[in-house]
């Protein structure tokens, strides 16, 4: 029993403090794990976005022949005619090599698709094209989970000079 004026921790108080500290540390460790996983997701999305922007910039540079890029699918060999559209064919081949090369390491089953459609009719005719680039891949979910299917679409308008 405590006498008058005695102070200090009892065993129960010490155990409660230990439980609270342990709970806080477990919560902190859990938040760190979640943050690391989200960092990996952000890294994947940044890399995939850069790959998509790569082909959009190539289409904008060759804007007069933007419709030649319609139907590009990196999972198959490029079908653009080399004789009539050499620049578009080169862009298609280079983009396909980029998505299957060393820069795409860690992105499983990375696939890029391009759809180009004419916008219109408008008065006066603006000759604009809508470019939709869709990227799909299997995301890395860590060591203990299965990879998850992910996709990203970017839309851009390409106007004549």
Question: What would you call each of these model-derived segments?
Answer:
Residues 2-5, 9-53:
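Aliphatic-rich helix starts adjacent to a transmembrane/signal segment
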Residues 37-161:
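Flexible, low-complexity segments enriched in proline/glycine/serine and punctuated by aromatic residues
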